[in-house]
């Protein structure tokens, strides 16, 4: 039985509350700023209570305000980010799942060599890989395309490693039973591995969706057309102006709208996400 210590519980709750405040306050501050005019935002001290221009700012930003600043509508920026994040998350999961499946359940020469070659890519800094990858994308004519934005980011050594470690815990008796039932590789993967892996897939999807949504450097390199910009690039372009000329009200509105999709993904998949991280039973 765990001994209840009121003082320890109080300290623990205070630390949690402090952590929540530290994380949530910048979001609240951004929301408050999104309800003010640009002049009010740059004139300190800014109020901690919402202003009178909340509906006006959001309406103007969504219906043309952002487009006048960066040359592309807010809806298009959000759509581009959604396409990129979904394609990267789904692509990474499919490729990593298939790679780990082949490495664990097939016996072929140098299979561990190929696994370690995949794993070693984790040691390479992004800056080392990004220039040759960019050259390939240019040569293939994939600048300003969704394929150029997503394909180079679909390979994932981390996800392959995590799936491999999970597959290694599959009982050998289960594999033998599938063989006795004449289950081929595809049927074994579809009927056994996929159901067992659903919580792991959900946890990885949350992580990889956020990874894809927050991409900045790669979209910055492979997009010249403003219509292919993601929401992160759009935000950066909005604050390229002089401080006094930056439409800070639109910036704050865009920032709030930019964090809503990742938050929704985390909230909607929270149960699966936590279960996928802690579940060990097969």
Swiss-Prot record:
Keywords of this entry: Cell inner membrane, Cell membrane, Membrane, Transmembrane, Transmembrane helix, Transport
The answer to whether the entry has keyword Lyase is no
Where is this chain primarily localised? membrane
- TM segments? 14-34, 86-106, 112-132, 146-168, 201-221, 248-268
One biological process GO term for this chain? transmembrane transport
Q: Where is the signal peptide?
A: none
Q: Which GO terms describe its cellular component?
A: plasma membrane
Q: Specify the superkingdom.
A: Bacteria
User: So what family is this one in?
Assistant: Belongs to the binding-protein-dependent transport system permease family.
NCBIfam families, sorted: PRK10973.1 (NF008210)
- Name it: sn-glycerol-3-phosphate transport system permease protein UgpE
Q: Which organism is it from?
A: Brucella melitensis biotype 1 (strain ATCC 23456 / CCUG 17765 / NCTC 10094 / 16M)
